[in-house]
Amino acid sequence: MSSAYCSSAVAVSAAATASSAATFNPLLSSHSNSQLFYRFTPKSFKLVANCPNPLILHSNIRRHRFFCAAETEASSADDEIQASVEEEEEVEEEGDEGEEEVEEEKQTTQASGEEGRLYVGNLPYTITSSELSQIFGEAGTVVDVQIVYDKVTDRSRGFGFVTMGSIEEAKEAMQMFNSSQIGGRTVKVNFPEVPRGGENEVMRTKIRDNNRSYVDSPHKVYAGNLGWNLTSQGLKDAFGDQPGVLGAKVIYERNTGRSRGFGFISFESAENVQSALATMNGVEVEGRALRLNLASEREKPTVSPPSVEEGETEEASLESNEVLSNVSA
């Protein structure tokens, strides 16, 4: 294609620009020997390429493409332009939708952690977490139960929190048990409005209650893969048929008061420990198979407890004075 032809095409473009002003729409302009396809914007633009290659023009708003083509190639060029633009816009729309989906997923994930949490008030002072879990189990899956105890007297304050597996189950539990009778008292069940510091109080009372009846001993068994609702008393009861059991404790998160999925059982002698390892390892407690190991006590811990083997994520760290031995059960 000659330079004179290109100059003529550009001149036609300039003439169309001057005559059509801001109301001009993209169209096909026919000539005797060629056809000019272009998109027009009323803003100023800059020529950055010359015919016969596509003319790429840039404005201060959006990029526009001008094409010069022979008469026999006009239809295919127009199709390619339209397909290219549609593909670009489709990719942009998909990108925006993807970002919105990711953001929505993040918000849903952040909100879902507390959706099933319920406040339960006016409880009988003698009710235990295990008993409350069994009651609310009629409404669905119970993830966690926390009863609040007085700091000084270690007596139940008559309220607590129950976390259900989903928001639907929480609503079902609220409908079933709000204003119902439990142990001769009319309980109140609703979604909690916990005052500042309330969660820390729940955590402290739960851990204090957990350690209150534990009898320590140098002869201990480490128990992993515990059910999330298993209490220290429940763990001790599971070993009730074993000789020489002194106590049991489940380890909880310091910040949240939730079970970490492992604990310890203390015994009177090393023989009792070996007997429990041989008998109870792999036994199911609340639907989960116990993973037992011999635990030993450090007299003067000077370093952090060693990391456990790969895959033991819930047992990633122990209390500072307790470690796992290399003895396999």
From Swiss-Prot:
GO terms for molecular function: mRNA binding; RNA binding. CDD domains: RRM2_NsCP33_like (cd21608). It is found in: Plastid, Chloroplast. Residues 77-117, 296-329 are annotated as: Disordered. Residues 77-104 have a biased composition (Acidic residues). The keyword Kinase does not apply. Residues 1-69 form a transit peptide. It comes from the Eukaryota. Residues 116-194, 219-297 form the RRM domain. Keywords: Chloroplast, mRNA processing, Plastid, Repeat, Ribonucleoprotein, RNA-binding, Transit peptide. GO terms for biological process: chloroplast RNA processing; chloroplast rRNA processing; mRNA processing. GO terms for cellular component: chloroplast; chloroplast stroma; cytosol; ribonucleoprotein complex; thylakoid. The keyword Transmembrane does not apply. Could be involved in splicing and/or processing of chloroplast RNAs. PANTHER family: OS02G0815200 PROTEIN (PTHR48025), RNA-BINDING PROTEIN CP33, CHLOROPLASTIC (PTHR48025:SF11). This is RNA-binding protein CP33, chloroplastic. It comes from Arabidopsis thaliana (Mouse-ear cress).
